[in-house]
Design a protein with these regions (language model features):
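N-terminal pre-catalytic segment of deacetylase/amide-hydrolase enzymes
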Residues: 1-14
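Active-site-proximal helix/loop segments of hydrolytic enzymes
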Residues: 3-6, 37-245
Length: 245
């Protein structure tokens, strides 16, 4: 879905992908109060907040979703009961690449949250280092990681940095094809029929918090935390497009 700028137009389009959704709730976390939280809900809220900020700054914004739904138009073999199969999960991410390309986006931003053991914490930003625009990927990833981490820690939250990393270390090996591919489908290159239509613009994917850490999960689930992340993401995007940057 596309949203026109509400501020003076800058004639730039940003594609925001709220990770997961619909049959795929993403990671399941918890807050300090014991409330169960779902990654797909949190990414959507951050996406929508970021959209409003960017539109006011003059950007045209295209988003992967505006509610709890898949991006993919579901087909045979995509669901098992009410959840995605491995095929469905893969097809859903491919659909996000298609959306970004059809939007003629100048920049792609993946919004996700991390998960792991309860002791795992910190922010990480991934980029793809083998695309023709790898230098721009890295430049934006550094801005995104720096600005989001600085905004959170300016409030005394003490979020560790997991740094800016190549997407070759961040993908999930859902099957042998995913393992052989070795990249995030949202950011990575073409790979036969597995990724026939990769994204065609620079981009990065951020996971600002571990929602399986109750402290970080509480931040991710709070409106204040979501707004802080959104403002910092919008700042990084604005810096990326700054003249002479």
């Amino acid at each position: 879905m596309a949203f026109a700028p509400t501020g003076a137009p800058r004639h730039l389009t940003v594609f925001l992908d709220a990770g997961h959704g619909g049959p795929d709730p993403g990671a399941v976390g918890t807050t300090e109060s014991g409330r169960t939280i779902y990654e797909a809900d949190l990414t959507l809220r951050v996406e929508l907040d970021t959209t409003a900020i960017l539109r006011a700054a003059g950007f045209r914004v295209v988003v992967s979703r505006t509610r709890d739904t898949s991006v993919l138009r579901l087909g045979p073999g995509d669901l098992s009961g009410r959840v995605f199969t491995v095929q469905g999960s893969h097809h859903d991410v491919l659909a996000r690449d298609v959306c970004a390309n059809e939007a003629h986006a100048n920049l792609l931003v993946g919004i996700y949250f991390d998960a792991g053991a309860p002791s795992y914490a910190g922010a990480v930003t991934g980029y793809d280092a083998v695309r023709p625009f790898a230098r721009e990927n890295l430049r934006f990833a550094k801005l995104l990681q720096t600005d989001v981490l600085a905004a959170m820690n300016a409030l005394g939250w003490g979020i560790p940095s997991e740094g800016v990393q190549s997407d070759t270390g961040l993908g999930s090996a859902l099957n042998s094809q995913a393992l052989a591919y070795g990249h995030l489908v949202l950011l990575g290159p073409a790979y036969g029929d597995y990724v026939a239509t990769p994204s065609r613009m620079p981009g990065a994917l951020i996971e600002p918090l571990f929602i399986t850490d109750p402290f970080e999960g509480s931040i991710a689930a709070s409106r204040h935390g979501q707004e802080v992340i959104a403002r910092a993401m919008a700042k990084a995007i604005d810096q990326y497009f700054a003249p002479g940057a």
